[in-house]
Amino acid sequence: MTDYLDAVIVEHNPSQKKIDRAVIWLHGLGASGHDFEPVVPQLGLSDDMAVRFIFPHAPKRAVTVNGGMVMPAWYDILEMSLERKIDVAQIEASSKQIKDLVRREIEQGVAPEHIVIAGFSQGGAVAYHVALGYPERLAGLMTLSTYLATNDSIDYSTANKDMPILIEHGSHDPVVPIILGEQAKQLLSDKGYDVTYHTYPMAHQVCMPQIQNIGQWLNSILA
């Protein structure tokens, strides 16, 4: 029996139809699944869509760069250099837990091509690992204020070679420097992926114009 991550569930379904779209959205280090819950009604999603948002809670673990403090974390960060030394085994374990959530959505009747994987900061690094290696075509990948931590260990799936990817970053992010977002965008573009890249005049956060843009993107790829 699969032990699923606890998650906050928000459904956008004005027409009261059967849910047939899903967005699995991962929070950042030290946060929780409640972090992006308030964003859903601000996205301006089409009333014709029936979308389930799944905001999982990360497991609690010691984080080396925070003095070994135990907090919600998708993986341990060993060093905050531009290379971002991380515990790869933990990011792979977290990725498996997210893939379990994807499979649960499929079992509930949501086709994989109608499932978006999204993440902010540390959650975005896991989202990259999950979506780029997923064996079935997904609706899209959205990564916010993050970095591609596991390029060398991802088994890139041909099923998602044409998957829309949205990368967004703050221009003066002091936590995840914008160069890391740019590197991810360039690497994936060079591999032939369909990447849309936006920056905003902000730090390590999200802003209202960005939320509106995310909503437009979701309306487009989930239509």
Positions of predicted regions on the chain:
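C-terminal catalytic histidine-bearing segment of alpha/beta-hydrolase fold enzymes
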Residues: 166, 182-223
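Short beta-strand/loop motif that positions the catalytic acidic residue
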Residues: 167-169, 173
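Serine-hydrolase catalytic machinery in alpha/beta-hydrolase-like enzymes
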Residues: 2-114
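Short alpha-helix in the alpha/beta-hydrolase fold that links the catalytic acid
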Residues: 36-41, 177-187
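Alpha/beta-hydrolase-fold catalytic nucleophile elbow
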Residues: 57, 118, 144-145, 168, ...
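Primarily recognizes the serine-hydrolase "nucleophile elbow" in alpha/beta-hydrolase
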Residues: 106, 113-160
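Alpha/beta-hydrolase fold active-site loops
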Residues: 21, 163-164
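Short helix-capping segments at alpha-helix termini
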Residues: 43-49, 109-110, 134-137, 190-193, ...
